[in-house]
């Protein structure tokens, strides 16, 4: 059992002002594996005060000092690799291989990217006799999701530390263990007191007072659209800066000159990875009518090879949904797809055979999907693919952009000119050509209802800065 009932505030592990705790469930076993403090407004107030006091000195640290701090974090993060991997598999249900290859590694990559971005980042610019200065924004509230416990947390922390902005972090109460390990890392390497504060709890007890606190100058949130909207409302009371990374319903356009096996394998991965609990999942697969039959045959073959099961067993590729609530949501969407007339091609409602314990869902494919159906318009956040056919490229692009979201898009094929045309036409913050992957120094964020602002690398650093003009500085 992992019992983390203390908060990390002002460089110390302290008792929570609340006597309540939150149980953490292993989604693969449905068993309680630990608990964390259920913080409240008093905890938030104490943490914000510590961060505000730390800001007075941390904002004036040099770039080299902040780089040195990030470098220490990188090295200690690497030392804690096994602890991080084990924690994520326990709390998220991610297969061990995925926890190591993706979750652990992505967290590390963001600290490295922020450290390296500072090599060439210009915080000052001379314009004649005047000076433009970029300064740390100040106390920043970070609220992170359960689906990527290290990635989403590390990218925000790394950017804030790179600028000299102290933070108060509220991780998801469903996957809080990785954040506790990060706190232990920061404590060991000597992150200055008050620069990092961890307050565990739920949205009502911690998220709301953090978003409303008058000394918090910036809120960075990753999660659902409705919650992001509420954070904006609360932040608007004192005009806080807000950075939001929200949902998606990303299109994956398959071109007619594609290698069919390669395309089927790629689109399968984009749907089942992390059990489909990915905001950038390419769940709307757009296929030319002329290759539909061949593509579907290969797609079924690829899905049949996906192994769902115990995340601690070798060979497991897909673990459980994070919770019963999430499992039920996925089941509701699958049933909705059937009700609205989509054809169930693979998978369907219920659990995979032999997996009655745990929140396991069946990887599912719908075909003959109309883009106006619920399963094509709403974020399911599970391993459910909607295959939509198109007749020509203009129609494919129109379907791809017919969504309220714009977080990511994908295209796969051979003709470079066509690939470039599609990539430039998709209305999304990130587009991948032929499974190129996203490097941590590239900006990440969404169009439309997928968010505000950008994260990752130097663009992520920009979010934690204010710009000051000093006229006559060089006179």
Swiss-Prot record:
The keyword Oxidoreductase applies. It comes from the Bacteria. It comes from Staphylococcus aureus (strain bovine RF122 / ET3-1). It is an enzyme of class 1 (oxidoreductase). Pfam families: Aldedh (PF00171). Belongs to the aldehyde dehydrogenase family. Its EC number is 1.2.1.3. InterPro entries: Ald_DH/histidinol_DH, Ald_DH_C, Ald_DH_CS_CYS, Ald_DH_CS_GLU, Ald_DH_N, Aldehyde_DH_dom, Aldehyde_DH_NAD(P). The active site is at 245 (proton acceptor), 279 (nucleophile). Keywords: NAD, Oxidoreductase. GO terms for molecular function: aldehyde dehydrogenase (NAD+) activity. It catalyses: an aldehyde + NAD(+) + H2O = a carboxylate + NADH + 2 H(+). NAD(+) binds at residues 146-147, 223-224, 246, 379. One of its GO terms (biological process) is aldehyde metabolic process. CDD domains: ALDH_CddD_SSP0762. PROSITE patterns: ALDEHYDE_DEHYDR_CYS, ALDEHYDE_DEHYDR_GLU. Signal peptide: none annotated. This is Putative aldehyde dehydrogenase. SUPFAM superfamilies: ALDH-like (SSF53720). Gene3D superfamilies: Aldehyde Dehydrogenase, Chain A, domain 1, Aldehyde Dehydrogenase, Chain A, domain 2. The keyword NAD applies.
